């Protein structure tokens, strides 16, 4: 804790001395932390989706989602967005389910995104120390941007961050799927 305070003072001092205009932060594991694993998140998403869908089992839904992501990765496609994932999941569900699955694709994607955002809001907590640093940077008139490799675009990230009132200081949100780029590639 003491080290982090010293580090934050050094960051603030550096920003003052060098007239820094922008500070960039990662979203997950920096500003907010998930309290469950990604696999648990998908399980919870599946359960919430099942409540709204005419699907007899959630297993096909979970398998369809994991299969789609695995196929994207096998094809070296790491720059996908949520709509692409859910469009492919929908197509798989149509293929494997009985005719009782009759939800419109657009509505399915909207519902899936809504549930995904809700679960992320429910199972994320803020990093108080980094948010305190945001406040101090903001007080220095440093603009704050979030950069994230996430399959939900900036609108979704803003909703997740917006559920945490302390994160209202953000000036800009950059999400990899909106730009078809990744931080890991140095493109974002």
Label every PLM stretch briefly:
Residues 1-19, 151, 157-188:
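Asp-based, Mg2+/Mn2+-dependent phosphohydrolase catalytic module
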Residues 10-65:
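Active-site neighborhood of HAD-like aspartate-dependent phosphohydrolases
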Residues 31-33, 39, 124-126, 152-155, ...:
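Flexible loop/turn segments at secondary-structure boundaries
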Residues 38, 42, 82, 130:
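Hydrophobic (often cysteine-bearing) scaffold residues that line and stabilize catalytic clefts
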Residues 43, 83, 87, 154-158, ...:
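Short, surface-exposed alpha-helical segments at coil->helix boundaries
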Residues 45-115:
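A metal-dependent, Asp-based hydrolase signature
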Residues 107-162, 173-174:
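Substrate-recognition element of Asp-dependent hydrolases with the DxDx(T/V) motif
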């Amino acid at each position: 804790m003491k080290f982090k305070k010293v580090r934050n003072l050094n960051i603030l001092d550096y920003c003052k001395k060098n007239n820094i205009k922008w500070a960039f932060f990662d979203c997950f594991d920096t500003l907010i932390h998930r309290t469950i694993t990604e696999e648990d998140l998908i399980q919870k998403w599946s359960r919430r989706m099942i409540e709204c869908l005419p699907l007899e089992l959630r297993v096909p839904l979970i398998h369809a989602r994991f299969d789609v992501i695995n196929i994207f990765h096998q094809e070296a496609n790491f720059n996908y967005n949520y709509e692409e994932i859910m469009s492919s999941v929908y197509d798989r569900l149509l293929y494997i389910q009985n005719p009782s699955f009759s939800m419109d694709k657009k509505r399915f994607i909207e519902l899936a995104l809504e549930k995904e955002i809700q679960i992320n809001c429910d199972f994320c907590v803020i990093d108080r120390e980094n948010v305190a640093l945001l406040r101090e940077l903001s007080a220095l008139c440093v603009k704050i941007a979030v950069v994230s490799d996430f399959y939900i675009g900036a609108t979704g990230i803003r909703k997740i961050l917006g559920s945490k009132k302390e994160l209202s200081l953000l000036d800009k949100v950059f999400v990899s799927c909106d730009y078809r780029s990744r931080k890991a590639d140095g493109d974002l």
